[in-house]
Swiss-Prot record:
Renumbered ranges of motif Bipartite nuclear localization signal: 198-216
Keywords in alphabetical order: Capsid protein, Helical capsid protein, Host nucleus, Host-virus interaction, Ribonucleoprotein, RNA-binding, Viral nucleoprotein, Viral penetration into host nucleus, Virion, Virus entry into host cell
Recorded name of the encoding gene: NP
Entry's Gene Ontology molecular function annotations: RNA binding; structural molecule activity
Disordered, as annotated region: 1-22
Chief location bin: virion
Disulfide bonds, paired cysteine numbers: none
Protein name, as recorded: Nucleoprotein
């Protein structure tokens, strides 16, 4: 397991590879990206999409969802065993948007899953290329993170909606493997564990028998993944307690919520990777770029360079602001939903506004919306600088934060102070230091109280000019310490509903 001391880079998790050197990793990630690009080109040919239609992000998402659905073995099996009226378990499809006589039209397409699997394997040298599928899942997850809030889900599990910065990857399917686990926030895993424990409380047989044994293994594995994200001994020791509990119940739920809260100040390590829509990879492959030969990294300059010269379009609803739609997709591309807006804005070279001030809804368009009334516009996905993505939470300190989000989860490895509001976070920690984890709780609270506002995280780390591919001259930005830094401030986003 990636969490047990064998530190593999994201790229190794991403490509399922064992330890490799940097060149091999770049090549295998490149192979994965090239496969996605080739698949996309082939699908555009099958669907007879024009160049313009192939660059439409809504078409890209439909094609991506089709291949994910075609390879979702569990769900496919379930659909075959529980046939529902009007749904063919062997087919997958979605809306494709075409430009006809100066208007956008929606066409619902249907394909055999078997056919989609064949096209995907053919694009990936005959292999299943699970890594590429996971990569697409992470792109969808990053898009959801930037688009929706998870207030309801947080409240349902007894957590505070202001803890949204811990919820990265909360819509990732379970089958997303080690690469998926790496990008999940502390709150996401806490929520999964709490759901398990609640089922165990309500269902006597949940932990029993052969199935229960498997459940128990999954529970302990998830505990280990979460433990691996924490950076302090006391937090890890508390996770050991939760993992070793004979019969997990309310005490464990309490401990997990305590740990999630503590992660607002003593942040966990959460990986960030730039995962782009399939059409971007398709465009690059079509223009002759050989990803495997050139190599590719999800955490370096490569995604920035790719976005610098890709033109992607999006459908825009009548009252939406195209610049805001671009910001949403830019944030999703760089997994920056929970990043400090000061940092994102500096790198992007444009002011980045909080979610509540965006005049845009999600990228996907519901089946009952009138497409003919919509126009399309170019998404501005370019950046002024680039920065290395981080896999750590940065060390921690505080600053006045906002009503909507009381902490950040850094995406870019750039020197700054990390905003959170100590008063708000600490208010949740009154009393309740009794019980078997009391000494650990006391220690965690002590560490949180000593976190200082002026402390800089990622010291000396900066952003780079796009011409500086080898990252030789870091530019360390200076930020206004008192500026509003959180994206979900004063939020009015839609809830995420499956």
């Amino acid at each position: 397991m990636a969490s047990q001391g064998t530190k593999r880079s994201y790229e190794q998790m991403e490509t399922g590879g064992e330890r490799q050197d940097a060149t091999e990793i770049r090549a295998s990630v490149g192979r994965m990206i090239g496969g996605i690009g080739r698949f996309y080109i082939q699908m555009c040919t099958e669907l007879k999409l024009s160049d313009y239609e192939g660059r439409l992000i809504q078409n890209s998402i439909t094609i991506e969802r089709m291949v994910l659905s075609a390879f979702d073995e569990r769900r496919n099996k379930y659909l075959e065993e529980h046939p529902s009226a009007g749904k063919d378990p062997k087919k997958t499809g979605g809306p494709i948007y075409r430009r006809i006589d100066g208007k956008w039209m929606r066409e619902l397409i249907l394909y055999d899953k078997e056919e989609i699997r064949r096209i995907w394997r053919q694009a990936n040298n005959g292999e299943d290329a699970t890594a590429g599928l996971t990569h697409i899942m992470i792109w969808h997850s990053n898009l959801n993170d930037a688009t929706y809030q998870r207030t309801r889900a947080l409240v349902r599990t007894g957590m505070d909606p202001r803890m949204c910065s811990l919820m990265q990857g909360s819509t990732l399917p379970r089958r997303s493997g080690a690469a998926g686990a790496a990008v999940k926030g502390v709150g996401t895993i806490v929520m999964e564990l709490i759901r398990m424990i609640k089922r165990g409380i309500n269902d006597r047989n949940f932990w029993r028998g052969e199935n229960g044994r498997r459940t128990r293994i999954a529970y302990e594995r998830m505990c280990n993944i979460l433990k691996g994200k924490f950076q302090t001994a006391a937090q890890r020791a508390m996770m050991d307690q939760v993992r070793e509990s004979r019969n997990p119940g309310n005490a464990e739920i309490e401990d997990l919520i305590f740990l999630a809260r503590s992660a607002l100040i003593l942040r966990g390590s959460v990986a960030h990777k730039s995962c782009l829509p399939a059409c971007v990879y398709g465009l690059a492959v079509a223009s002759g770029h050989d990803f495997e030969r050139e190599g590719y990294s999800l955490v370096g300059i490569d995604p920035f360079k790719l976005l610098q010269n890709s033109q992607v379009f999006s459908l825009i609803r009548p009252n939406e602001n195209p610049a805001h739609k671009s910001q949403l997709v830019w944030m999703a591309c760089h997994s920056a939903a929970f990043e400090d807006l000061r940092v994102s804005g500096f790198i992007r070279g444009k002011r980045v506004v909080p979610r509540g001030k965006l005049s845009t809804r999600g990228v996907q368009i519901a089946s009952n919306e009138n497409v003919e009334a919509m126009d399309s516009s170019t998404l501005e996905l370019r950046s002024r600088y680039w920065a290395i993505r981080t896999r750590s939470g940065g060390n921690t300190n505080q600053q006045k934060a906002s009503a909507g989000q009381i902490s950040v989860q850094p995406t870019f490895s750039v020197q700054r102070n990390l905003p959170f509001e100590r008063a708000t976070v600490m208010a949740a920690f009154v009393g309740n230091t009794e019980g078997r984890t009391s000494d650990m709780r006391t220690e965690i609270i002590r560490m949180m109280e000593s976190a200082k506002p002026e402390d800089l995280s990622f010291q000396g780390r900066g952003v780079f000019e796009l011409s500086d591919e080898k990252a030789t001259n870091p530019i360390v930005p200076s930020f206004d310490m008192n500026n509003e830094g959180s994206y979900f401030f004063g939020d009015n986003a839609e809830e995420y509903d499956n």
